[in-house]
Curated annotation (Swiss-Prot):
Its main location: host cell. This is Nuclear shuttle protein. Keywords: DNA-binding, Host cell membrane, Host cytoplasm, Host membrane, Host nucleus, Host-virus interaction, Membrane, Transport, Viral movement protein. Belongs to the begomovirus nuclear shuttle protein family. Binds to the genomic viral ssDNA, shuttles it into and out of the cell nucleus. Begomoviruses use 2 proteins to transport their DNA from cell to cell. The nuclear shuttle protein (NSP) shuttles it between nucleus and cytoplasm and the movement protein (MP) probably transports the DNA-NSP complex to the cell periphery and facilitates movement across the cell wall. InterPro entries: Gemini_BR1, GV_A/BR1_coat, Viral_coat.
Length: 256
């Protein structure tokens, strides 16, 4: 004879319960067709442009860069601004890849009333330096960046290997420096220089970050940089009355 198989006590409750439904409800429409339920997201995260490689070209020249003997001027490398248009950077940080620097120096002896005073050659030393500022900061109301003397000491440091003062080494680091000996006998002498500097390597990357309160204030100037700004130091020393006019182009390769 056939035996009757017993069902578990919760069999009816399990399959007759209205609270258990593992599959989405399909609604029926006219014509017998059915359409599955659609899940809609109520909030969306902003879409950010992926990081791309780019090069920013900047030229530094003009009256503020013109140097007399035993003077200096400090500038900075402008970083890209942030914007949704696709130009510049897409984040509040960039990876610094490399820098390509080229320029010319126009050196000339300052002519006096007596032309016999400039009949002999006069000479001087021009120094161009890239300096990493790991913690950029300017107090409120201060516009001037650190001078050559504040970073390296007396101008006589131009004649030897540049070395930061002990009290500046915790914040600054010399990336590269170029020296050019120039001479003139009244006419203008032109000297050229060029170099490439690798910043990030396979083992070590250099990142620069920004404050970026909003897109309106998301530029690449020194005050908006919160980490790893690059200062540009121009210095010219001479024992004679001379002037030096540099024209420099800086190409910064970055990912951002």
């Amino acid at each position: 004879m056939y035996s009757i198989r017993k069902q578990p006590r919760n069999f009816q409750r399990k399959f007759n319960s209205n609270t258990t439904n593992r599959f989405p409800i399909r609604r029926k429409y006219v014509g017998g067709h059915t359409r599955p339920s659609v899940r809609r997201r109520l909030t969306y995260e902003p879409v950010e442009r992926p990081l791309v490689h780019n090069v920013l070209c900047e030229k530094q020249h003009g009256d503020v860069f013109n140097l007399q003997q035993n003077t200096s001027y400090t500038s900075f490398v402008t970083y890209p601004s942030r914007g949704p248009s696709g130009d510049g950077r897409s984040r509040d940080y960039i990876k610094l890849q490399s820098m390509s620097v080229s320029g010319v120096i126009h050196a000339k002896a300052n002519c006096n009333d007596d032309p016999m005073e400039v009949s002999h050659d006069v000479n001087g030393v021009f120094v161009f330096s890239l300096i990493m500022d790991t913690k950029p900061y300017l107090p409120a109301g201060v516009q001037a960046l650190p001078t050559f003397e504040e970073l390296f000491g007396a101008y006589s440091a131009c004649y030897v290997n540049l070395r930061l003062l002990n009290n500046q080494q915790h914040r600054y680091r010399v990336l590269h420096s170029v020296k050019r000996f120039v001479s003139s006998a009244g006419d203008t002498k032109v000297s050229q220089f060029r170099f490439n500097k690798r910043l990030s390597t396979r083992r070590y990357n250099i990142w620069a970050s920004f404050h970026d309160g909003d897109l309106v204030n998301a530029g690449g100037n020194y005050r908006n940089i919160s980490k790893n700004a690059i200062l540009v130091s121009y210095a010219f020393v001479s024992e004679h009355s001379m002037s030096c006019k540099p024209f420099v182009q800086i190409e910064t390769s970055y990912v951002g």
